[in-house]
């Protein structure tokens, strides 16, 4: 039987250290979000408190996305563009053959539902 186990210390990430040095401890249930989405930019004016759901709204577009815009997809069956925005557990959808109409709807709906955490790419 082993007498001791290796113990690893994981230091807080730098953006957390920067936030706590200026603002004190992070409230329970909150994350520190990078406003510009760049995890290397730890300037205090680029950091903000975010709930987990708000942090997920601000995620980058997945690499598997072929349309280039979050929430935009092409339906082969209906031959229409589809816009999808999710907030508070509810999925909001809009379909149209006009691409610009769907893109405008996505931008407008994200701004309305996600506020300052809206991210489009």
UniProtKB/Swiss-Prot annotation:
Which InterPro entries does this chain map to? His-Me_finger_sf, HNH_nuc
Taxonomically, the superkingdom here is Viruses
For this chain, the annotated S-S bridges are none
Q: What is this protein called?
A: Protein 3.8
